A protein has these predicted regions:
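Glycine-rich, flexible loop motifs
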Residues: 192
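Acidic/histidine-rich catalytic cores and adjacent linkers
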Residues: 189
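Domain-core detector
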Residues: 1-186, 197-336
Length: 336
């Protein structure tokens, strides 16, 4: 395994440990909710939940500059990778505010109780969902910060997926390398991260431990691991020449997360105007102007007239120019 791959795996391990700590803290807060009045209990813990997850996002974002700087040095590339970590807090990947998203744990619990599921089992389901959402939100912020930090070197950059050890088939079929404008796809509980690759030759061989395609990743696995990840029948089909993506997608789709606890193709965008006057479709978030309270029981969110763009949308506006991408990220407050 290359030094770059080892560096990326260590970064991934630390990011995973952080997200799991945040998930445990969020779950502890959730367990204080009283079954006799879930909504009132939620209103009491909501501020603390928001603080716990936002603090985790901040820690995750602060890890980015050191990681991407080390990854760049390993490839003989210099340049600043500073970001504004605070800009990566307070919102989910899709641009929704954190606490209303976490309220899915409460709605899920209430729905199960209403269907006759025992209170204990219903709360266990709510705890599991709370843990998933909290951890995913932290990992997403870290991945966005990694991507933004990796751009700040005035070089053409691609991002290789560092597939998490023990990954599932949905992650395995996303192994590969893509242009920096490509969205980072993932599912709930995905632990994969990215590695910035600096090369003027997009066809240059990747360092050992990184894979250019789902097929390359499949070939790197032992037969036992192939069977575990893709199922015995699926793995045998791939060994006989079937496309790994087709085999996995025949069983289940791969989508980005939109609403808590379910998978959808893409969040609904809004039309916004950039500082240079161009209009575009964007995934946005409000600027923390909601109040904790009954709105969570109505529709799970509260929108304001103020919005800010998420990094992936801003990067997509750059038309493939990394210098332009950094300029836009600076305009929107993600880099100094």
């Amino acid at each position: 395994m290359s030094d770059l791959s080892r560096l990326a795996l260590e970064h991934q391990r630390k990011r995973t440990e952080l997200s799991e700590r945040v998930a445990r803290r969020a779950a502890r807060l959730w367990r204080s909710v009283q079954a006799s009045d879930i909504d009132a209990s939620w209103d009491r813990i909501a501020p603390a939940l928001g603080q716990v997850v936002s603090a985790g996002q901040l820690q995750a974002a602060r890890m980015a500059a050191g990681y991407t700087s080390a990854a760049a040095r390993a490839q003989g590339v210099a340049g600043p990778g500073q970001i504004i970590p605070e800009a990566f807090t307070g919102a989910t990947l899709e641009g929704r505010e954190i606490v209303p998203e976490l309220f899915a744990a409460a709605t899920t619990t209430k729905r199960l109780i209403g269907r006759g599921v025992g209170v204990g089992s219903a709360f266990q389901a709510g705890t599991a969902l709370m843990s998933i959402l909290a951890a995913t939100t932290v990992r997403d912020s870290g991945n966005m910060a990694d991507k933004v930090s990796g751009l700040r070197r005035g070089r053409t950059v691609q991002y290789a997926r560092m597939v998490s050890p023990g990954a599932c088939s949905r992650c395995a079929i996303l192994a590969g390398v893509g242009h920096f404008t490509k969205h980072f796809e993932r599912h709930p509980e995905c632990r994969c991260t990215t590695v910035p690759i600096y090369s003027d030759n997009p066809n240059a061989p990747l360092p050992e431990g990184l894979y250019g395609s789902p097929a390359d990743y499949f070939e790197s696995l032992s037969k036992a691991e192939q069977d575990r990840i893709y199922t015995k029948a699926g793995a045998e089909a791939i060994r006989m020449g079937a496309d790994p993506v087709s085999v996995v997608n025949a069983r289940r789709g791969m989508f980005r997360v939109q609403q808590p606890g379910r998978l959808v193709a893409r969040a609904t965008p809004r039309t916004l105007v950039a500082p240079d006057g161009r209009t575009f479709q964007a995934y946005v978030t409000t600027e923390n102007r909601m109040r904790f309270g009954s709105q969570y029981r109505v529709d799970g969110s509260r929108r304001s007239s103020s919005v800010r763009l998420m990094p992936e949308t801003i990067i997509s506006m750059s038309e493939g120019d990394p210098v332009r991408a950094v300029e836009l990220l600076r305009q929107f407050g993600y880099v100094p």
